[in-house]
Amino acid sequence: MPHAGRHCLSTKYRDMGIFGFFNKNKKETLDKGLEKTKTSVFDKLARAVAGKSKVDDDVLDNLEEVLITSDVGVDTTLKIIKRIEERVARDKYISTSELNGILRDEIAALLAENNSDDNDNWELPADHSPYVILVVGVNGVGKTTTIGKLAYQFKKAGKKVYLGAADTFRAAAVEQLCIWGERVGVPVIKQQMGSDPASVAFDTLSSAKANGADVVLIDTAGRLHNKVGLMNELKKIKDVMKKVLPQAPDEVMLVLDGSTGQNAFEQAKQFSAVTQISSLAITKLDGTAKGGVVIGISDQLKVPVKYIGLGEGMEDLQLFSKRQFVDSLFKKD
């Protein structure tokens, strides 16, 4: 059995040459990743305004259906429709050809209200070292993979990264994190199966602090079916972290699978009831037409989307930019 606080960093890293293959232009990756969502929305919008020259009640009813079936969510859809109704009432006449641009503007405004910044130039705060990110989410959403990709990108930016395997209930979770640690070339702190997750978090932060780390990413169990147990576990992890670093965690990031649409929204609501969430990472947007869920989740939770996953590659986890997201979604070919 591995002893407490053991590193599972291999001295023999995997071939790092593969990463060069994924070094694509970020905007191209975003456009490609949102292609299915964009095509679906455009097709539905075309049907919504078919035979109409101006935006009227029928068009708005059709638009409501377009947004709901694009996984924007009912409450957020009604909010967008209300804003467009107000513009129609104010301007008296809006042609259907203007609808695309108006919709883009309203969605961008909505994302701005929810603190979803244009994160193009986001930097680690200089006064928080190490910067600690507690990562939560149910199993299967791409949580550990997201941690691995973040570790890669932070390391590539010249940061010293530590990973903590605090999902001690699943051997596969620890093994997967260790594989990512080897692949990226960063240490992973782990304990034996069934250990106290808070103890793993303590060891990880202690080691990271002692070794001058810049970033710490802590993986956690996603046992949402046991809400009270999960709530207590996350509270204990946070309390123990503060014994090492009083400001920790700096960020609690919820990872959601965008391809599940409204299920992701339900998970987000349930996790928000369990612990305070400060940022969202929405994965698997490249293989789905359900990208509208990004808009609804951000609006309803009032939590900023920070990262979006647009493919399998290391570079395909991007900092979220509301401006680029909306531009890609509504860009006419």
Show the residue positions of the predicted features.
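N-terminal accessory targeting/assembly segments
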Residues: 9-46
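Short beta-alpha junctions and helix-cap segments that line functional grooves
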Residues: 18, 119-121, 150, 266-268, ...
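Primarily NTPase-proximal linker/entry elements flanking Walker-type ATP/GTP-binding cores
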Residues: 31, 35-166, 173-193, 201-209, ...
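Short hydrophobic/aromatic residue motifs in ordered secondary structure
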Residues: 74-76, 170, 286, 314
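Conserved catalytic-core segment of NTP-binding enzymes
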Residues: 176, 196-211, 225-331
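Short glycine-rich anion-binding loops that position phosphate/pyrophosphate groups of nucleotides
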Residues: 221-223
